[in-house]
Structure formats: C-alpha cells, structure tokens
C-alpha cells in the first residue's frame, strides 16, 4: 500500500502547453525551487525569451523535431523518463542515459477551438489532433506513483505550494492523475464526436453538411454534488454539470444560504429559471413539481418584481406553498419581506440579491437562496432524455415567436391588449408539462392546466384553478402548447369566456376549430410551432 502522505520531490519537469495561461509564472517558480526544465517548441521559446532556463527536448534527446512537429516528444528518453519505475527500472534507465522526469505539465492542441471556427476543413482538423501530448499525459498518469501530471492551469498554484512544503503527496498525485485521464477522455471524445459526423458516403470525405449526431455520442459532466437521495428517498443521486457550461443556469448558480439542494430542488429550480428567462420586463415564476403554477410580468419597472410576485402568487397560492420562486431582476428587500411573511418556500433564485434582501431571507435559515448571475442570449444546446438502455438526444427548444410570426386565422383579429397577453401565455405554456393549457389576463396567469392526457381536461383544470383563486376567466386569453384536434377545446373555452386563443395549428380539423372560434367571436392565432414538454 502506498503511503498517502509520502511527499514526492521534483527535480526535473517537462513543460509543453498549448494554453500558456500562467505557465511562465509556474516555470519561474519551478526554476527558483531548483527544478531542471525540459520544454518544446513554442513553450520553450516563451520561457527562453523571458529568461527562464530550460533545455529544449530536441537537445536533450539528440533527435530533432521532424515531420512539421508531428514527432517531438515521442522518444525513449522522454517516455522512459516518465514511465520509469523508481527503484525498479533505475539500472536500465542509467544504461540508456535516461533521466527521470518527475513532473509533466501538458495541455493539448486546441482541437475544439479549431473545429469551431467557420470554414475548418477535415485536413485542418486532423492536423490539430494532438498525439505527443496525450501520450505524455497518459504515461505520466499511469506512473503517478513517481510522477506528477498537471493538465489544468488552475492546479499550478497548489502544486507549487506543495513543492515548497517538500513535495506532492501520493493523494495529490492520485487526484492529478484522475484529472489527467478525465482530460484525455474528454479530448478523445471531442475528436470522435467531430469525426463521427463526417459524411462517409461522399466520394471525398467532407465535413460539409456533417451530421449533428455522431456515430457515438461522447460528452463529459463533472460531479458538483452528491445528494442525500434522488427523486424519492429510496433512490441514490448526484448532480453533474457540464465542464464548460455555455450559459447561465442552475448548473452555474451560487447558493448563498439554506440547506443543501435536493434532487427535486435542482430540477424544479431549473424549470423556474428557464421560464423566467423568457421575459424582458420584471417577472416572477413560481414552480411546483417542475410546472409553473403562477407567472406574472410587471409592465413597468416601477412595480418591479414585487408586483410580479404578488400577481404570480395570486394565481395559485395553494400550489405555491413549498414551491420554487424565480425572478429576472435583483431580489430586493420589499419582495424578500413579502415572501418570507407570506409563504413557505424551498428555493428563491434571482440574478442577484441585495444586501438588505439577503439579511431578510437569513431569518429563514432553511430557505435556499441562489444567485444565477445575469443571462444574455439563449444559446443552442443539447437536451437529453434517458430511456431504458438508451438516450434520446435533441436540440434544446429555444424556439421563440414574435407578433410578426403569428398568423391570424379567425374573422376577428386580437386586440393589441389581447396580443400582449397571448404572447405572454404562449411563453408560459412552453414550460408547462403537456398537455398544457394556460389562461392569462394582463400578463398574469389566472389558471394553468398541466400534464393531462386530454387537452380538454387541461383546459377544465385551468378554469377550476382560476375559479378557486377568485380570478375571472371572462375576457382572458388561452394558450395551448399543441394544436386542438377537435373543436371541443374551443367550445369549452367559449363557455368560460375566453376571448382569444394562441396555438400552433396544424390539425386535420383546423377548419372546424377555426369555425368554432368564429362562431364564438374568439380571435385565434397560429404560431406554427409546437412546444410539447414531457
């Protein structure tokens, strides 16, 4: 058994990096600690130009770089020095003049950045597949008992601290080894994903029109948190996040206070935050079991999120109990006070939180308070759905509509006020489990029908919710996430007083549905876009 606390001194290091962030400072500190440095190509030149003593690998091996740099470090004096087992291979190393290399600092050719550039062709991509780098990384990782492998610039500081304390412990080297294999696994996964999308049916292999979906699907997530349990207490769970999230979300949020997030907290907070991102004006979204139960937008900044919260809460105060609340503006003291004095809440998330609001929420120690940071444009990404023995992969639903995208299909067009409410209700319906029906007035939900097998029943539930909350349906608008297959959905809407409807259209019986709306004097618009959510 290896002693976890035994420290490994570093006498010789090999440095060869594409990303040179922090490498000059790291090398200077190593030099100051008496470490001999071997280096290659651009890294060697950077060190030399800045007065850091280093030996070029070609001078050390006696073998010049060749094949336009394809062969630099693939040499027994390099890999023997990395893979040589101290105390076992010493004699053979001495016989061949191989010096032990105790630390390897390597990161790889920027394959992902290269293939992301417009116009990148297959030969360019191939030339940016690193060979020597991963080979050194894997060699050093395999021999982590005797060698430290550093692939992340973020680790330079802790490595130097340990060296100043006498060396790296085995536990530290093991952790660095794990990071190294994670690094090479992600790198190879990127290459396989890219090449797996190449059109192999063409006479000449081409990346033009390459498939979005490679032959094997490789992606990497990093464990952020182990949880007490999963969706239910008998299930184990953990939360994994993308290594480099491209967009603000629950995966990048910062928790300011409260109990540890549960599995359901994460899922519900994601639903609330993604919904509230849809709105430009001050907005509040309250979610329960991944469904919005109350959403409202304040038409001006004067009322702000306090007014939006009051209206969202009024939609369904019963369901709001123990829910998740998301805002698209900084959480202020007045809104925080209104929440803690009125209801039990699991999670509150906002782009930022004022000092006064944070102090108020602190009186409820169990409330989980999160900041998301401010978001910008929604970016394309993948959505995943696990099935038994497989994985469904699709592009994320970031489809949005504006008034210009809508097609008025009835004799009566919506009024300006109705149009604003229709677009609001449509944005909400996108985040409601199918079949989804949303009733809204004055950019406030007044009833949400979610997750029913029958669209008509979802509409009935929305009406029941509105009645129970004491909110008037007469004159409200209705949004449906998918088309109405029969006219009964519109007939029921007319009975409760709905004045305008927004839906995708596309049913075989659209003409019957439109006729039902015309008979009732209901204005109806088609979006041409469906928002199923399962």
Swiss-Prot record:
One of its GO terms (molecular function) is IMP cyclohydrolase activity. GO terms for biological process: 'de novo' IMP biosynthetic process. The keyword Hydrolase applies. The keyword Transferase applies. It comes from the Bacteria. Pathway: Purine metabolism; IMP biosynthesis via de novo pathway; 5-formamido-1-(5-phospho-D-ribosyl)imidazole-4-carboxamide from 5-amino-1-(5-phospho-D-ribosyl)imidazole-4-carboxamide (10-formyl THF route): step 1/1; Purine metabolism; IMP biosynthesis via de novo pathway; IMP from 5-formamido-1-(5-phospho-D-ribosyl)imidazole-4-carboxamide: step 1/1. Residues 6-151 form the MGS-like domain. Transmembrane segments: none annotated. It catalyses: (6R)-10-formyltetrahydrofolate + 5-amino-1-(5-phospho-beta-D-ribosyl)imidazole-4-carboxamide = 5-formamido-1-(5-phospho-D-ribosyl)imidazole-4-carboxamide + (6S)-5,6,7,8-tetrahydrofolate; IMP + H2O = 5-formamido-1-(5-phospho-D-ribosyl)imidazole-4-carboxamide. Gene3D superfamilies: 3.40.140.20, Methylglyoxal synthase-like domain. Keywords: Hydrolase, Multifunctional enzyme, Purine biosynthesis, Transferase. One of its GO terms (cellular component) is cytosol. PROSITE patterns: MGS (PS51855). InterPro entries: AICAR_Tfase_dup_dom_sf, Cytidine_deaminase-like, MGS-like_dom, MGS-like_dom_sf, PurH-like. Its EC number is 2.1.2.3, 3.5.4.10. Belongs to the PurH family. The IMP cyclohydrolase activity resides in the N-terminal region. This is Bifunctional purine biosynthesis protein PurH. It comes from Pseudomonas syringae pv. tomato (strain ATCC BAA-871 / DC3000).
């Amino acid at each position: 058994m290896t002693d976890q606390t035994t420290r490994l001194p570093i006498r010789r290091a090999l440095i060869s990096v594409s990303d040179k962030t922090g490498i000059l400072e790291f090398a200077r500190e190593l030099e100051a600690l008496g470490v001999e440095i071997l280096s290659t190509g651009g890294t060697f030149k950077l060190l030399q130009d800045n007065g850091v003593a280093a030996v070029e690998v070609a001078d050390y091996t006696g073998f010049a770089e060749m094949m336009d740099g394809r062969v630099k470090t693939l040499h027994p004096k390099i890999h023997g020095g990395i893979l040589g087992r101290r105390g076992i291979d010493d004699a053979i190393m001495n016989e061949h003049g191989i010096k032990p290399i105790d630390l390897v600092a390597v990161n790889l050719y920027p394959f992902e950045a290269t293939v992301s550039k417009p116009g990148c062709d297959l030969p360019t991509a191939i030339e940016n597949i690193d060979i020597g780098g991963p080979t050194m990384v894997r060699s050093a990782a395999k021999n982590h008992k005797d060698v430290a492998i550093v692939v992340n610039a973020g680790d330079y500081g802790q490595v130097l601290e340990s060296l100043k304390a006498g060396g790296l412990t085995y536990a530290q080297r093991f952790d660095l080894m794990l990071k190294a294999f994670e690094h090479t696994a992600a790198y190879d996964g990127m290459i396989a994903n890219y090449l797996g999308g190449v059109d192999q049916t063409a006479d000449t292999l081409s990346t033009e029109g390459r498939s979005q979906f490679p032959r094997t699907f490789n992606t990497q997530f990093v464990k952020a948190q182990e949880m007490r349990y999963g969706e239910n207490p008998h299930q184990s769970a953990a939360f994994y996040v993308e290594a480099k999230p491209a967009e603000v979300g629950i995966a990048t949020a910062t928790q300011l206070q409260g109990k540890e997030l549960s599995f359901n907290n994460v899922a519900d907070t994601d639903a609330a935050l993604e919904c509230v991102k849809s709105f430009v004006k001050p907005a509040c979204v309250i979610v329960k079991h991944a469904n919005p139960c109350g959403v409202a937008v304040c038409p001006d900044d004067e009322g702000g999120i306090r007014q939006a919260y009051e209206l969202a809460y009024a939609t369904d105060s019963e369901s709001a109990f123990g829910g998740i609340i998301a805002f698209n503006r900084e959480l202020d003291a007045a809104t925080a006070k209104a929440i803690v004095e009125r209801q039990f809440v699991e999670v509150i998330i906002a782009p930022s939180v004022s000092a006064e609001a944070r102090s108020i929420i602190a009186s409820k120690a169990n409330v989980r308070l999160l900041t998301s940071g401010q978001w910008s444009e929604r970016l394309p990404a993948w959505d995943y759905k696990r099935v038994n023995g497989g994985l469904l992969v699709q592009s994320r639903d970031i489809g949005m509509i504006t008034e210009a995208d809508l097609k008025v299909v009835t004799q009566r067009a919506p009024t300006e006020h109705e149009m604003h409410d229709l677009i609001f209700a449509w944005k909400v319906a996108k985040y409601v489990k199918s079949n989804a029906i949303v009733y809204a007035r004055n950019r406030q939900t007044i009833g949400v029908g979610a997750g029913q097998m029958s669209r008509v029943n979802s509409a009935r539930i929305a009406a029941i919710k509105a009645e129970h909350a004491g909110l008037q349906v007469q004159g409200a608008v209705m949004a449906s996430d998918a088309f109405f297959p029969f006219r009964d959905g519109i007939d029921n809407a007319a009975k409760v007083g709905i004045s305008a409807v927004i839906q995708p259209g596309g049913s075989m019986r659209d003409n019957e549905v439109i006729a039902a709306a015309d008979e009732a004097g209901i204005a109806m618009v088609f979006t041409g876009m469906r928002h199923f959510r399962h």
